[in-house]
A protein has these predicted regions:
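Catalytic alpha/beta core domains of metabolic enzymes, predominantly
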Residues: 1-67, 76
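C-terminal functional modules
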Residues: 53-181
Length: 181
């Protein structure tokens, strides 16, 4: 049910969700409520980077798409903190990845050593963080859209569930999302 609600929200053209054909269980209503708690949030304006940056950072009352992740083994506490940074904004949507660059501004001094995940190629739905080996982009969160060679510049944080992969195709530049476990 939670992936279905995320999919409906990603379509960005639904005002109301009705359940029919059978009674929803308490667990299903709880799943819907948990997703909806992540959707509408208020984010204060960040001023530490100057007026120009503070005006383009997402702030105010926001609607964001919560994406569920199956966390990979070995993710560090620093990587988890960056991953769960409140609201990611799609800065670029290129054919092979979704990029959320604001975390690299807030976490530019973080230490993110390279971790081997044992994969030669990342696949659609893999959630990545740029590590110390690509310092200019370090701490940027990326979501793979197509197979991409693992060059040692990104660490695997986890994977969007198979049932929710279709949601990624509905995300566009400027959309705001958050990562949940």
């Amino acid at each position: 049910v939670s992936d279905q609600v995320r999919h409906i929200l990603a379509m960005n053209n639904v005002d109301e969700i009705l359940f029919g054909n059978a009674f929803a269980t308490e667990e299903e209503f709880k799943q819907v409520a948990d997703v909806m708690k992540e959707v509408y949030v208020h984010v204060d304006k960040v001023t530490q980077f100057g007026e120009m940056i503070s005006n383009i950072l997402p702030h105010g009352d926001l609607k964001r798409l919560p994406l569920g992740i199956e966390l990979a083994e070995g993710v560090t506490d620093t990587e988890k903190e960056i991953l769960h940074y409140g609201s990611h904004q799609v800065s670029e949507y290129i054919h092979y990845m979704i990029r959320s660059r604001w975390t690299r501004l807030f976490y530019k001094n973080a230490d993110i050593p390279c971790r081997d995940c044992g994969k030669e190629y990342f696949e659609k739905g893999d959630v990545l963080i740029v590590n110390n080996n690509l310092s200019f982009y370090k701490a940027e969160i990326q979501i793979c859209m197509k197979p991409m060679k693992n060059t040692g510049q990104r660490n695997l944080l986890g994977h969007i569930s198979k049932d929710a992969l279709c949601i990624l195709d509905l995300i566009h530049k400027g959309d705001i999302f958050t990562i949940t476990e």
